[in-house]
Amino acid sequence: SGHSVGCNIKLPFEQSPNPYTQTSITFSYFFIRKVLLVKYSYAFIIMPGGFGTQDEFFETLTLAQTKVINDFPIVVMGKEYYEPFHQWIDQMIAAGTIGQEDKKFMLFTDSVDEAMEHISKYVRKNYTVKPRKRLWWLFEKV
């Protein structure tokens, strides 16, 4: 298990830090929070939530679709909760407003093991130490 950092937003109602995080950072502005969430995350796990959750979900999907962020796994937990959204995605594909390949950005599941395997596969692929090819040998170009 890793260190969990929560990014909270200061609102006049409802928000309090997640009790399951080791560190909590509170932001005054949504846009700063969203930028830092994406910048310092290896993946997103989307849980059932309200407008703020959906806003972050759509922003991240858009960044992945437009290749602003690459190979960023988005795990959607709560298959039943998100089934209408899943159907809406299929309607957008049928209407031609998004491509079939845009579905690859999301994994819909209820399984913690499946979610962790999906994220682990991505991390192993994208965050490994790779040997660097030597560019110089005795100061000569190769």
Describe the role of every protein-language-model region:
Residues 1-47, 51-54:
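Phosphate/pyrophosphate-binding betaalpha-module
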Residues 59-65, 90-94, 123-124:
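Short, solvent-exposed amphipathic alpha-helical segments in soluble enzyme
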Residues 3-14, 47, 61-87, 100-101:
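Short, acidic/small-residue loops that bind anionic groups at enzyme active sites
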Residues 105-106, 110-142:
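SAM-dependent methyltransferases
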Residues 26, 49, 77-78, 107:
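Glycine- and other small-residue-rich loops at beta-strand/loop junctions that grip anionic moieties
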Residues 33, 53-56, 81, 115:
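General structural feature for long, well-ordered alpha-helical segments within catalytic domains
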Residues 28, 81-110:
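Short, glycine-/small-residue-rich phosphate/pyrophosphate-handling segment
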